[in-house]
Design a protein with these regions (language model features):
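Active-site beta-strand/loop architecture of penicillin-binding DD-peptidases
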Residues: 1-112
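Short, highly charged C-terminal tails/helix-capping segments
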Residues: 114-119
Length: 119
């Protein structure tokens, strides 16, 4: 399932939405907001999720308008001149996907959507 792979693989953009014992699938979206005829650094981040992916019962969408950057989401990379640089993330995979995962973790037991993973 392509939507599940976005959440539960290292290559996926929504790993923060993965909740143990739940089959969550989804799609992230990050849009730059326009300002004065060009794009600003402000973003609108969305994560649309469905669960459980093996038998979809629920859809949950999180949309964040201008999410704050967090020091917890800091990507370090080696600069071409040899030193280390970093970027604070505030894209959907780091913000709205995490919110969705936390909410689904809390409401999942109420909705009785736990599943047993079969390999």
């Amino acid at each position: 399932n392509a939507l599940r792979k976005i959440v539960n693989t290292d290559e996926g953009t929504a790993r923060f939405a993965d909740v143990q014992n739940y089959e969550i699938g989804g799609k992230t979206g990050t849009a730059d907001q326009p300002e004065g005829g060009k794009y600003s650094e402000a973003k609108i981040n969305t994560f649309s999720s469905v669960f459980p992916t093996s038998n979809p019962q629920f859809v949950f969408v999180v949309m964040l308008d201008t999410p704050k950057k967090s020091k917890d989401y800091y990507y370090k990379y080696r600069h071409r001149k040899g030193g280390w640089k970093g970027t604070l993330y505030n894209t959907a995979g780091w913000t709205s996907a995490e919110v969705a995962g936390k909410v689904i973790d809390k409401i999942g037991p109420i909705l009785a959507t736990k599943y047993i993973q079969v390999d």
